[in-house]
Amino acid sequence: MEEQPLCNLSVKDLMEAGAHFGHQTRRWNPKMKLYIFEEKNGLYIINLAKTLYQLRKALPQVCKVIKENKPILFVGTKKQAKCVIKEAAIEAGEYFVAERWLGGMLTNMTTIRNSIKTLDKIEKDLTQNSSYLTKKEIALLAKRHQKLLKNLEGIRYLKKAPGLVIVVDPSYEKIAVAEAKKLGIPVLALVDTNCDPTPIDYVIPCNDDSLKSIRLIISTIKDSIIDTKKKLGVEIVSPIKTLDIQDSEDMDVYATDEDNRQEDLLAKKYDSNEAN
């Protein structure tokens, strides 16, 4: 019999993290009724025994994706989730989207890869060819670099479609969920009482607005990924790399309308070069 991933969480741990607090009763989705314990003071209380059961049922599927040598994509762009998502993905050597989800990140990867090529070219110019650039050009390039990196750093080295997408709050990340479902990619999600669980393959009912709740559950998933990789002898490689590129905000260059126009022209130049 195959060894099951460890899940050392208890109902008490989940309760202390506030994972049981759902939304106000007037904001619920009836399809979440299965996971609700009771109504109290105008709030729905999530059945944490079911949360624990669902998590323990989902973890073997997470580990199965790792064993099949498929990447995992963490998605959480709302304020409470983004730092947790990014940290967990980096520690586990997986991929993430913690800022804005760009339409087509999964379903139109050709366009996304062109943007990544643009990012690569800008980094090369800033790190290797900067002696040929004016201070103004460097500042404009650095600004363009920051914009691209902010949205793309977590998927920059994602070479194939993920085997699993892990989402915090599918109602907030509905475009990501829709793209995953269109491609037949399973979705594991932290789902609150206001969400529709129907499109989710692995539902983890919990408070998806609490930082403590999100961190506790995502950390448990992350630990299972790391443990599985160690048992398989798989190297954990960070999905991001750090370059010594000066922040454009630190440069003594004032943004004018002409600067913005030049930035737009610069962006078009790089984009057209990659298209060719």
Curated annotation (Swiss-Prot):
Any one GO molecular-function label of the UniProt entry: structural constituent of ribosome
Pfam families, per database record: Ribosomal_S2
Annotated signal peptide: none
Recorded superkingdom: Bacteria
Any one GO CC term of the record: cytosolic small ribosomal subunit
Homology family: Belongs to the universal ribosomal protein uS2 family.
Protein name in the entry: Small ribosomal subunit protein uS2
Gene assigned in the entry: rpsB
